[in-house]
């Protein structure tokens, strides 16, 4: 990734509550802590540069806490997904690392239900480069899975690159993003605009590139 490439990151964790996670991040980032409520019980940290860091509920996380150093089941308050604002590697990676260290110090940890999502800016991509990227991911499916140690119970949230998608895209050789989008969503039900659209649960998810 180029140091100037814009990206966003979502990090799932447990061990502490969403409020405590937001407070831990505030020790690094500063800013104003707001409670957004809603079903996702979101806490929002608005920093002095105007960006917003969110700490929200995710139903896929197995909630745990520690008592006397022993992990035990916890309530949904201990489901924490950190959603970053738009970042760049050059300006923000050290700050992200500081936030993670602060969260760990506050008691956050992960288990096998936790994952990480990285969203890359697709502004400089072309339809051809997207197709090339899809083929690279498909050709190295097994290598990526082995390197990342993706466990069977997490596979439903991190599916391999679909062979039918790759075959269709290579046959059609789409020249516009609209055509790529049609191929990407082919066979799925429901609105494409849905936040938790079924197509997002893959090792590579194309929506952020297409937007």
Pin down the residues of each PLM region.
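Short, conserved phosphate-binding/catalytic loop or strand-edge motifs used
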Residues: 112-116, 120
């Amino acid at each position: 990734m180029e140091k100037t490439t814009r990206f966003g990151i979502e990090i799932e964790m447990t061990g502490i509550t969403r409020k405590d996670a937001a407070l831990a991040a505030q020790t690094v980032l500063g800013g104003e802590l707001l409670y957004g409520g809603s079903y996702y019980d979101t806490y929002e940290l608005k920093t002095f540069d105007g960006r917003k860091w969110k700490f929200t509920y995710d139903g896929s996380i197995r909630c745990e806490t520690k008592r006397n150093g022993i992990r035990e089941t916890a309530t949904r308050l201990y489901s924490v997904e950190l959603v970053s604002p738009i970042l760049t590697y050059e300006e923000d990676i050290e700050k992200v690392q500081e936030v993670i260290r602060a969260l760990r110090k506050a008691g956050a940890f992960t288990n096998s239900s936790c994952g990480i999502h990285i969203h890359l800016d697709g502004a400089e991509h072309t339809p051809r480069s997207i197709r090339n990227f899809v083929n690279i991911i498909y050709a190295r499916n097994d290598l990526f899975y082995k390197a990342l140690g993706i466990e069977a119970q997490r596979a439903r949230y991190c599916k391999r690159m679909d062979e039918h998608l790759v075959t269709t895209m290579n046959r059609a050789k789409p020249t516009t993003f609209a055509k790529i989008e049609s191929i990407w969503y082919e066979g799925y039900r429901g609105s494409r605009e849905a936040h938790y659209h079924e197509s997002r649960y893959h090792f590579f998810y194309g929506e952020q590139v297409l937007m």
